[in-house]
Swiss-Prot record:
This is D-alanine--D-alanine ligase. Residues 97-290 form the ATP-grasp domain. Belongs to the D-alanine--D-alanine ligase family. It catalyses: 2 D-alanine + ATP = D-alanyl-D-alanine + ADP + phosphate + H(+). Binds 2 magnesium or manganese ions per subunit. GO terms for biological process: cell wall organization; peptidoglycan biosynthetic process; regulation of cell shape. Mg(2+) 1 binds at residues 245, 257. The gene is ddl. It is an enzyme of class 6 (ligase). Cell wall formation. GO terms for molecular function: ATP binding; D-alanine-D-alanine ligase activity; metal ion binding. Keywords: ATP-binding, Cell shape, Cell wall biogenesis/degradation, Cytoplasm, Ligase, Magnesium, Manganese, Metal-binding, Nucleotide-binding, Peptidoglycan synthesis. Gene3D superfamilies: 3.40.50.20, ATP-grasp fold, A domain, ATP-grasp fold, B domain.
C-alpha cells in the first residue's frame, strides 16, 4: 500500500513538519508500506493527492491544523490522520478554544486584542498569537518596555494576540492515542526547559529541554486529567492522536491549549510519551495506520 505523507506548507512550522515527515517516512518504510512525500505547496499537489485513498497529515500550523487541509481531503473523499475540520478550527484558534472551555475546565484568564492596550494582569504575564503553534510568538512579559515591544512585534506578524495570566508551575503535556476506537492516555510528561519557558528554541534544540515521564503521578492528578480529557473528547471529535499542554500548580491542572497534529520529530512530546508506555515510534505509526484500516472496514 502506498501512503502519501502530506508535509511542508507555508506555515512558520514548515521545517518542523518536514522533520516529522522524514521520521514518518522511515517508519512507514520499516513497516513494509510504500511512503510518498507530498509537499502541500507543490503546484500539482491536488492532482497527486487524488491518486490515493488515505493520507498521513504532518502539516503543523496553518493549513494542517487550522482545518483547511482536512476540509480539502474530505471534499476529495480521502481518509486522513488526525482530527476533523471542526475540531481543528476549535483548537487551533486559541481564543475560540478558551471561549468554549473556560467555564468547564481550569484555564488561565485570557483576553484578546488587536492593538496596544493597558496590561490586564500584573507582571509577569504571557502574550501569544491567536493562531500559531510550536510556541512561535509566545513571550513572558516582565515589564512595560517588554510589553510594548513584544506586543507590537506580534501584532505586526499575527494581527490578533492573546494576553494571558501567567501560571507559574510545572509544565506538563498530556498525550492521547487512539487504538481500537478508544483513546489511551499515555504517561504524562513533565517539561523541564533550561530556559525560562518552553519556547520554540527549547522545543527543537537538543539538550535545551528535559522531557521527564511521570510514571507514578498521584491518583488525584490522574483523575483531574481524565476529567479534562473526557470533557474535551465529549465536546470535540478527535482522531488518531492529540496532545494537551497544561500547567500543574498546587494539584490543579490549568489547560493551555490542544494540539491536533502533534509533532513527530525525534524531540517531540507525543512520541516520547509513547516510548515511556513501551510503544516504539514504528508501533505508534502502525497503530495510526491500523486506525485507517478499521475506519475503511467499518
Amino acid at each position: 500500500m502506498y501512503i502519501p505523507i502530506i508535509t511542508g506548507g507555508k506555515s512558520k512550522e514548515r521545517e518542523i513538519s518536514l522533520t516529522s515527515a522524514k521520521n514518518v517516512f522511515n517508519s512507514i518504510s520499516n513497516l513494509g508500506y510504500k511512503p510518498v512525500i507530498l509537499d502541500l505547496i507543490d503546484d500539482d499537489f491536488i492532482n497527486k493527492i487524488q491518486n490515493y485513498k488515505f493520507a498521513f497529515n504532518v502539516v503543523h500550523g496553518d493549513y494542517g491544523e487550522d482545518g483547511r487541509l482536512p476540509s480539502l481531503l474530505e471534499i476529495l473523499g480521502i481518509d486522513y490522520t488526525c482530527s476533523n475540520p471542526e475540531t481543528c478550527i476549535a483548537t487551533y484558534d486559541k481564543f475560540i478554544f478558551y471561549s468554549l472551555f473556560k467555564n468547564y475546565i481550569q484555564m488561565p484568564q485570557t483576553t484578546l486584542t488587536n492593538k496596544l492596550i493597558l496590561p490586564p494582569f500584573e507582571y509577569p504575564f504571557i502574550i501569544k498569537p491567536r493562531k500559531s503553534g510550536s510556541s512561535k510568538g509566545v513571550y513572558i512579559i516582565h515589564n512595560e518596555n517588554e510589553y510594548k515591544f513584544y506586543l507590537e512585534k506580534d501584532l505586526k506578524e499575527f494581527q490578533e494576540v492573546l494576553v494571558q495570566e501567567y501560571i507559574k508551575g510545572r509544565e506538563i503535556t498530556i498525550s492521547y492515542i487512539q487504538k481500537n476506537e478508544e483513546f489511551i492516555l499515555l504517561p504524562i510528561l513533565e517539561i523541564i526547559p533550561k530556559k525560562e519557558f518552553y519556547d520554540y528554541e527549547a522545543k527543537y534544540t537538543n539538550g535545551l529541554t528535559e522531557l521527564k515521564p511521570q510514571l507514578n503521578s498521584p491518583e488525584k492528578i490522574i483523575q483531574k486529567i481524565n476529567e479534562i480529557g473526557n470533557h474535551v473528547m465529549q465536546t470535540l471529535t478527535f482522531k488518531d492522536m492529540f496532545r494537551i499542554d497544561a500547567i500543574l500548580k498546587d494539584d490543579e491542572v490549568y489547560v493551555l491549549e490542544i494540539n491536533t497534529v502533534p509533532g513527530l520529530t525525534e524531540l517531540s512530546d507525543l512520541p516520547t510519551s509513547a516510548l515511556a508506555a513501551g510503544i516504539s515510534f514504528d508501533e505508534l505509526i502502525n497503530i495510526i495506520i491500523k486506525n485507517h484500516v478499521a475506519r475503511v472496514a467499518g
